[in-house]
Amino acid sequence: MELSPSAHVDTFCRDNLPPPEQWAELRWDLPELQYPQRLNCASVLLDDVLAEHGADRPALHSPSETWSYGQLLARANQLANYLRDEVGLLPGQRVLLRGPNNPWLVACWFAVLKAGGVVVATVPLLRSSELTALIELTRASVALCDHRFAEDLTGVAAATGVTMLCYGAGDSEDLITLAADRPRTFSDVQTAADDVALLAATSGTTGKPKATMHFHRDVLAIADTFGKHVVQGQPDDIFTGTPPLAFTFGLGGLLVFPFRVGASTLLIERATPTELAETVQRFGATVLSTAPTAYRAILRAGQQDRLATIRRAVSAGEHLPQAVWQEMFDKTGIRLIDGIGSTEMLHVFISAADDDIRPGSTGRAVPGYQAAVLDAEGKPVPDGTAGRLAVIGPTCCRYLADPRQANYAQHGWNITGDTYLRDADGYFWYRARSDDMIVSSGYNIAAPEVEQALELHPDVLECAVVARPDEERGSIVHAAVVLREGVPADPAKVAELQAFTKQQIAPYKYPRSIEFVPALPRTATGKLQRFRLREPQAAG
């Protein structure tokens, strides 16, 4: 496709877009997806919203303070002025952001985009080696870092020639202090709608980082598809949740969606599930985004009544078990909104809400997207047949200078790496990540199906299922199981769980290997690390 003339002086991003023949098809079928050629998403989400709703409207809450839209705009503009005039940031240059979810991280995000820069957001948990790899990949020239997380970045910045500025310390060298005397107005760079706004980092099975390139129009597109038609945010909503803003799930649910409708967002740096429920109750939050693990933990802790003000609860990051959906509905009346998205697609593209929800199904294609289940040759399979999930819409995968682009974009579709089946009504039913399908003695076994069966047992708190190599069968089903407190972890319990599973699903799917563990390996954001379970003793 032909791109609009770029406003970027530094053309690194556009120069390293995938070749056109490796792009999936793009579609802008909805009227709300028709954007002008010149578009800066920061201007639309902040300046335009302020003009419509007023400067005094609350924009950002934290446990200690609230910023209005006017305060956020003034501070973002001061930062943008400093980045342009003192740091010398040029349109198109990459700026790495490092910090937890708080108002100043949001101000930095807006400032970079207003100045025409490209945001490379990172979670504070990344260590020096990971930061080095990402900086080398994206050629970032500036880093804005919460002072509490500067240690791992300081040496990396010096070694890579990155200009590093810290915020939040309050001293004379602090970015906030340095920008405090700058003008509170700024003339935003008039970027092209298809200029790169974000480089969203993700990692493959090899661990080598990838960066997906998303345009300014893509940022608005996720709000005008999933945000508008499924989340259905309102100006009086208070959004909150746990995903980092560096993750596209968090970026959409905690920044783009609320700002698109003039709502406010409650930012939490860290929270256990119980603390999350308490915070929801304290602030009267109405839209919640978090992982299935957190919803399950809230239920297990008996904290679900604290979610009384929630009218929309989004679950993403991993498959939502039907049992969790049902328990939440039975105890609170909340219908969890399941969805599947990806960093490559920027956000959720299959989901359902309200009466359209079918518990256990991920949903149907979000308005603006088209989804299908394909075979290995890229041909649609009959309904009810498992195959590769494929999607097209207004966003797509564009890896930064990465040969793995050809694996994700095939036959005009984005191939997500998930195994699904579609029913006759167009609902998509998750089977497994493609690499979570277990082939044992010629049988295809979906790990999540075995997990759901095991979790029906009253002694099982949670579990995870993976393939383990086996000389006779090729692979066997292995389950790492967390038992409820006080339940003995002994061979008798193994046999009991195996027999129980055979009663729930086809006997050939039962876990031939069961390992009791105190906890499942997860990232700091709660996402299960299945790869750590695939090697013996890795779970414990």
Residue ranges of predicted features:
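Conserved AMP-binding/adenylate-forming
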Residues: 65, 82-129, 244, 444
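AMP-dependent adenylate-forming
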Residues: 43-68, 166
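AMP-binding/adenylate-forming catalytic core of the ANL superfamily
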Residues: 126, 143-145, 288, 390-393, ...
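Conserved AMP-binding A3 loop
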Residues: 68-70, 190, 197-224
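Gly/Ser/Thr-rich phosphate-binding loop
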Residues: 285-290, 299-358, 370
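Conserved ATP/PPi-binding loop(s) of AMP-dependent carboxylate-activating enzymes
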Residues: 364-368, 379-411, 425, 443-445
